[in-house]
Amino acid sequence: MNKKQLILLCMLAVGGSVQAQQWPDTPAEARPGTRWWWLGSAVDEKNLTYNLEEYARTGMGAVEITPIYGVQGNDANEIQFLSPRWMEVLKHTQAEGKRTGIEIDMNTGTGWPFGGPEVSIEDAATKAIFQTYNLEGGKEIEQDINVTDPKQQPYSILSRVMAYDEKGKCINLTAYVKKDKLQWKAPAGKWKVIALYIGKTRQKVKRAAPGGEGYVMNHLSKKAVKNYLSRFDRAFKNSKTSYPHTFFNDSYEVYQADWTDDFLEQFARRRGYKLEEHFPEFLNESRPEVSRRIVSDYRETISDLLLENFTCQWTDW
């Protein structure tokens, strides 16, 4: 080894030593995090402490608590979600997280999507139910108008009954329906009558933890989302527990949740025309140009309501 090589090696060794000494501590947000499944919320202080110490030892910076269904045969150790005992173990977890340098995050619910025992059928995920009747005009018409799906009959609400002739004329017949019967002196011609019912998806929370079972909420309703979040406000306030570092949403896996109570009013205000005057085009599965444009407006309105009534309200909360 010549003199130049020896000098270079010495410089590299000194430089590496200086860099190692100057390297800053890695903050929690720069370290990896992990999902922390609480199976049945069957947890206790001793084991929570042990797990957090192990997470810290291996370099973890955050955990995301998600309560989920329990292990078969371990029911006796399960804790009801947001119960006083559940809040106790969460408070312990937060204290230990602070001690070990780990940020504690939490799902705003159990399993997925958001929902639970305090979600009433009124606040549950909502869908549109359309029924079509082809009627001959030029006479007094008496037609039964009722939702045919027996599972929807206890919950569905009649929203609109609209009539359309072959020339595109539209008449709102909602006021002519009394006790599930349409009574209408129809002008001559062939009429397509479309009834819109506001129904419920009846979807339940998937993989719910004990105390988290119930209907999925209506993410498109400002009132339903507010009511859902109020359960958390009460639990944290009554137990004097600090909110976690971050709340998160596991997923938005809702099925057929394509409507909300004031959707028609919201659509008219945002898109500048009444969707109910174009139900035939909206429901046309062959999708000509006008139908595609109407469906696009419908989807944009759904997007607006999801953003404003769920995402923004939840984030502001």
Give the residues covered by each predicted segment.
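Glycine-rich, proline-tolerant flexible connector loops at the mouths of alpha/beta enzymes
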Residues: 66-79
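Mature extracytoplasmic enzyme cores
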Residues: 21-26, 31, 43, 47-49, ...
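Bacterial Sec-dependent N-terminal signal peptides
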Residues: 1-21
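Conserved residues at the C-terminal ends of beta-strands
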Residues: 39, 66, 250
